[in-house]
């Protein structure tokens, strides 16, 4: 629900969005419904669909197609066996396209089958400006989303304990059956180190999508999520967006007990 019209904090992004996670209130947006390439922000959808449809302790066998997937990688080997939960950490911390493909094949039966599940979830969440064709976010026709849709998706996913725990993790180790040492994955999301209260969510880049970022932070019991698409100055813009949200819309102003939201009484 949107209470009044969201204001606009200008950024260097082609599109941006800022949302209160608990209420779903849109606090700021610029070109928020513009359909754009989203690179690895796709993996937010991949993760939540896998969490909801798979079993975290199941063992996934990595296919040759997954192991050979181009782009950012965990360097998984064909035939390697790894738990779904560990793949999810590799997916969200290191943006492994091999992990995304292995997850999709395991949970959806195929990349196409998993994309079907992704689009079902998008429809369920009212993501009217989104379409998913693959689990990694590699540039492909018919694969896009919008800043507002991604804010809605991230807010939904952050209500899931498993998802929330993964995306706030700075460093994760996991068993590596092929070597004498463990996998060690360091989260690419610099906001976790640079911004007070930061607790998620995902970076993204392709040559066509350029720099994309979804971040979240919690202060004084209030969690906000910020989205920028095609933004060369994304780290600074996210600090500005989140600062703006916490300062202009502290928790008590986002929703007051008994207040009507979009025509409906809000029950606390």
Language model region names:
Residues 127-128, 139-144, 148-268:
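Domain-terminus/edge residues, biased toward the C-terminal soluble/receptor-binding domains
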Residues 1-161:
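Active-site-adjacent loops and short helices of periplasmic peptidoglycan-processing enzymes
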């Amino acid at each position: 629900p949107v209470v009044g019209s969201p204001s606009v904090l200008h950024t260097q992004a082609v599109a941006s969005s800022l949302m209160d996670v608990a209420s779903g209130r849109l606090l700021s947006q610029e070109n928020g419904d513009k359909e754009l390439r989203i690179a690895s922000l796709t993996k937010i959808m991949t993760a939540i669909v896998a969490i909801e449809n798979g079993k975290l302790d199941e063992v996934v066998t990595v296919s040759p197609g997954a192991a050979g997937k181009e782009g950012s990688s965990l360097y998984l080997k064909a035939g390697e066996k790894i738990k779904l939960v560990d793949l999810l950490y590799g997916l969200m911390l290191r943006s492994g396209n091999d992990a995304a493909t292995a997850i999709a094949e395991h949970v959806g039966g195929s990349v196409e089958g998993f994309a079907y599940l992704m689009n079902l979830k998008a429809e369920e969440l009212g993501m009217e400006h989104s379409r998913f064709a693959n689990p990694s976010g590699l540039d492909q026709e018919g694969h896009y989303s919008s800043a507002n849709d991604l804010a809605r998706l991230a807010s939904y996913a952050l209500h899931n304990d498993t998802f929330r725990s993964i995306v706030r993790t700075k460093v994760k180790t996991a068993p590596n059956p092929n070597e004498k040492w463990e996998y060690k994955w360091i989260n690419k999301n610099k906001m976790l180190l640079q911004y007070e209260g930061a607790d998620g969510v995902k970076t993204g880049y392709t040559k066509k999508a350029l720099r994309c970022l979804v971040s979240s932070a919690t202060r004084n019991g209030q969690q906000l999520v910020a989205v920028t698409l095609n933004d060369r100055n994304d780290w600074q813009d996210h600090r500005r967006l989140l600062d703006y949200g916490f300062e202009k819309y502290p928790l008590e102003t986002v929703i007051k007990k008994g207040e009507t939201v979009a025509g409906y009484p809000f029950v606390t």
